Amino acid sequence: MNTSPDRVIIFDTTLRDGEQSPGAALNVDEKLTIARALARLGVDVIEAGFPHASPGDFDAVQKIAASVGSEADSPIICGLARTTQKDIKSAADALRPAAKPRIHTFLATSDIHLQYKLKKTRQEVLEIVPEMVAYAKSFVDDVEFSPEDAGRSDPDFLYQVLERAIAAGATTVNIPDTVGYTTPSEFGALIRGIKENVPNIDQAIISVHGHDDLGLAVANFLEAVKNGARQLECTINGIGERAGNASLEELVMALHVRRSYFNPFLGRPAESTEPLTKINTKEIYRTSRLVSNLTGMIVQPNKAIVGANAFAHESGIHQDGVLKHKLTYEIMDAESIGLTHNQIVLGKLSGRNAFRSRLQELGFELSETELNNAFIQFKEMADRKKEITDRDLEAIVNDEIDTVPDHFRLELVQVSCGNSARPTATVTIRTPDGSELSDAAIGTGPVDALCKAIDRVVKIPNELISFSVREVTEGIDALGEVTIRLRYEGRTYSAHAADTDIIVASARAYVSALNRLHVALQQKEKTPEMLQV
């Protein structure tokens, strides 16, 4: 195995660490959709989940291994496991369909974790790590070990742990900055120290994993690459626990745009034009939008690379410069991440074949049933909007691939409000037993009345903690996308919907979020003793 490749391995953990963002819970079908997108994007490794955490996670990892990772040229499919036999065996079982399975096992090494969380001594850790790495190695050839909270661990102890993990068969050793505490110079020095002080480090690839609590994750990773790290663990849009993880799109485009700077650190001539990663950068924007839509986590407008303002220029001086030559104020082409500027693409006279063709050009793969349903939505929208743009089509398709089971289905919504009238909403909802129930409510505003009317029918307790509206397209007939977040027993459930009528979009988003909560409650009844990770 080449443990010092002249390229950077991209390890995506959107489906594992990214899903730990509050409100980002995904069902199995949604995870499969994202996994397929990650494969198209060209990531080397997909961390599909934590198989022993719950039956749902096990099922997701197994299905991703079978449908996305079963071919010789598929990405490596990885499952997370603590350093216990039960965890590792669950990961091995879930990964069995994968052509290239990897078990990723971890144990904390910082004194604060040993004392307060694990209640273990350093000597116990030195004994557990090689034993469990060897156990994982008995199932798969590819084993990754992570010393959790490595950034706050004693370096000399860390070197000993890594040496034993590699001797036991670890092919990748991952260095996590678990709480986002280190600075770039410190993190670079940590990686350099590992290169210089772990005797058998040439037998493993050095990986890094980091959180963005101080906004330094990407900078830390780039410094790590300069000092010998060759695998970067990251997520789409930087989603993850607390302030999130290192952002895949920012890392990849930094290596892409500043290739001549990073080339020498990977043993290449500075002028080499060979890509530093296997990522198809033209898939970045579409993958970002997909993850945002399925998780319900909106990308802030000023987000680097994929934010709505990333290629926008307000200043007259900047606009003038860009019109004369893009490079005056843009360091990369928007098309390099797959962001096109197509406007009018279809209208109400467009047929099904034209609709299908445009979706294929945009990279969407729909089944016949999904295509038929999406085309019906397109025709309905075309009756209300004169011009249909790619963003409109994207909203239609994202609604169609929103795979939350339709236990409660919105059949009718009607709202009455005004400056001298009490907002009143009437809804009709088809319930899981097939009956249609109608009810009405008044509220402080139209959305409040709407949610109260829906609650009177659905009767699922919850707390609405976030309601937001943003425009999908421009103009007076623009689509409005509503994102709603509910909380129940400490967990958050998100959903979104788009429509030219934001009241209708609000109703659809609220019902969709309630459906997610309903599914979670059903699963909880079936598996009452879920493992908390």
UniProtKB/Swiss-Prot annotation:
The reactions it catalyses are:
3-methyl-2-oxobutanoate + acetyl-CoA + H2O = (2S)-2-isopropylmalate + CoA + H(+)
Record: residues binding Mn(2+):
D17, H209, H211, N245
Question: Origin, by domain of life?
Answer: Bacteria
Main localization (coarse): cytoplasm
Q: Which cofactor does it need?
A: Mn(2+)
Indicate whether Amino-acid biosynthesis appears among the record's keywords: yes
Could you give the subunit structure recorded for this chain?
Homodimer.
* Protein name from the UniProt record: 2-isopropylmalate synthase
